[in-house]
């Protein structure tokens, strides 16, 4: 989701900006290539989901590093400069509606002076931010009567109902190029005893297979896409017919999903960051209308009712449920009693 734009200046100032890429599910781009009514609604929903995510980043993750009397500290602001560039094709000239949101490396401090942005929170919370976008997009599409299905719950991915993996692969040669190059690089690095994170290898594969952009001849592309759709059977899939609907998931249903997510993460760890819970809850609530606004209200209610508590761990604010803290306390007491018996 995130890459970096660099310049040739000094190390401290060399990051020109942070490039966030928001991409609609492939089936949505394919459907938009044959369905003008759906395309108009999809682009509106996509832009809304992108804006929602960028607003969250601006209000929560824009910071700068400050040094006073030899001590460094991170100071939060609430402003950023962001340029959005919208595309409808990938480099292989296949349908792919996506937006590059480039956050310029400048934010104003309380005195109105520009400061270089400290990107730590943005990079740290990539998974959460990606899911934040996907859930908002899914909700907006469903509120326009579009039919979606969760295809990968673990990764929080959805597609339009009716589209199979084969349909999507028919328009995903760029993705296949990157995957093939990634496999080659993994084997090469392994033979040389080099260990790199998978994300870094994929980024290198993307760059190595990136061809120069070509000027799009849309009439010819539409003809080629129509042939591909017919050959792989996409034309037999009923078209989406958007129509505004009222939200159908009631607050009680949402609370049940959020409670289950809290129980699941509490069973894995005593204390967790809000973003860790949010990413899980959003994945669990994908296609059910759950967004970050619901999670924020849920957290506020839990804190107010003393069933969720703030704690400090690993240098940042974490949260723990009442039950987890009680269990940890009982284990601690048992351990203390056992030590006394041995003494």
State the predicted function of each range:
Residues 1-343:
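Helicase P-loop NTPase motor core of nucleic-acid translocases
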């Amino acid at each position: 989701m995130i890459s970096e734009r660099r310049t040739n200046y000094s190390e401290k100032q060399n990051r020109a900006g942070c490039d966030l890429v928001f991409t609609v599910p492939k089936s949505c781009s394919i459907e938009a290539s044959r369905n003008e009514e759906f395309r108009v609604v999809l682009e509106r929903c996509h832009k809304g989901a992108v804006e929602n995510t960028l607003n969250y980043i601006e209000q929560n993750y824009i910071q700068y590093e400050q040094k006073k009397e030899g001590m460094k500290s991170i100071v939060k602001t609430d402003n950023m400069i962001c340029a959005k560039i919208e595309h409808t094709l990938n480099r292989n000239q296949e349908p792919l509606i996506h937006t590059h949101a480039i956050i310029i490396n400048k934010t104003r401090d309380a005195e109105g002076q520009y400061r270089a942005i400290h990107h730590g929170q943005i990079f740290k919370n990539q998974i959460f931010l990606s899911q934040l976008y996907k859930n908002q997009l899914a909700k907006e599409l469903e509120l326009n009567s579009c039919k979606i299905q969760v295809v990968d719950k673990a990764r929080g991915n959805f597609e339009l109902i009716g589209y199979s993996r084969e349909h999507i692969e028919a328009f995903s040669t760029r993705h296949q190029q990157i995957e093939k190059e990634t496999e080659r690089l993994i084997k090469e690095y392994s033979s040389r005893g080099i260990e790199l994170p998978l994300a870094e290898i994929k980024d290198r594969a993307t760059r190595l297979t990136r061809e120069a952009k070509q000027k799009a001849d849309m009439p010819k592309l539409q003809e080629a896409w129509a042939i591909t759709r017919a050959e792989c059977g996409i034309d037999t899939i009923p078209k989406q017919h958007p129509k505004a609907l009222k939200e159908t998931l009631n607050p009680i249903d949402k609370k049940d999903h959020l409670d289950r997510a809290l129980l699941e993460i509490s069973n894995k760890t005593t204390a967790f960051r809000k973003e860790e819970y949010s990413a899980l809850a959003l994945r669990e609530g994908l296609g059910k209308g759950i967004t970050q606004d619901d999670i924020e209200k849920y957290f506020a209610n839990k804190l107010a009712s003393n069933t969720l508590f703030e704690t400090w761990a690993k240098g940042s604010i974490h949260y723990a449920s009442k039950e987890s803290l009680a269990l940890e306390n009982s284990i601690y007491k048992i351990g203390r009693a056992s030590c006394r018996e041995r003494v």
